[in-house]
């Protein structure tokens, strides 16, 4: 079952770079590198490219793109300043309902395919009461929903 939905954000470690205009950031002379996870390997990378296409901004990142093998490496490119901005998971830079550092813009979820976070109970664990309780917690608990929201995830529809 899907217990959460990932959210994409255009983020920068520079607290003043990202406002609410993706095009302005990507076309800025100050942005020489834009980090994106490899879309062949990472759902957030695919979502980033879908967003660029939806907004007609594919050309804005030509020659500026730095591909990360995964979303963790992509975050590191931006966090360390090796890329001025990047498309990362909101959960990487968000805590208690706000950005931990830097600046970001949460990409509207209608611009990319849903990034589902799924949980399963393996056959080996079907008799494990702790595992069953944890899955029930993820599915039914208001506390679990509050935790997901606080750390930048959406709730599955």
Q: Where are the regions a protein language model picked out?
A:
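Exported/periplasmic ABC-transporter solute-binding proteins
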Residues: 1-157
């Amino acid at each position: 079952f899907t217990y959460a939905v990932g959210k994409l954000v255009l983020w920068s470690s520079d607290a003043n770079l990202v406002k609410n205009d993706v095009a302005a950031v990507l076309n800025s002379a100050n942005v020489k590198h834009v980090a994106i996870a490899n879309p062949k390997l990472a759902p957030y990378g695919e979502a980033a490219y879908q967003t660029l296409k939806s907004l007609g901004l594919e050309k804005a990142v030509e020659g500026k793109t730095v591909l990360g093998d995964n979303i963790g490496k992509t975050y590191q490119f931006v966090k360390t300043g090796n890329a001025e901005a990047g498309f990362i998971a909101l959960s990487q830079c968000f805590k208690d309902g706000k950005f931990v550092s830097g600046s970001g813009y949460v990409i509207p979820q209608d611009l990319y395919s849903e990034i589902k976070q799924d949980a399963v109970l393996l056959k080996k664990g079907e008799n494990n009461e702790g595992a069953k309780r944890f899955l029930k917690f993820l599915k039914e608990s208001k506390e679990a929903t509050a935790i997901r929201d606080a750390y930048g995830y959406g709730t599955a529809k």
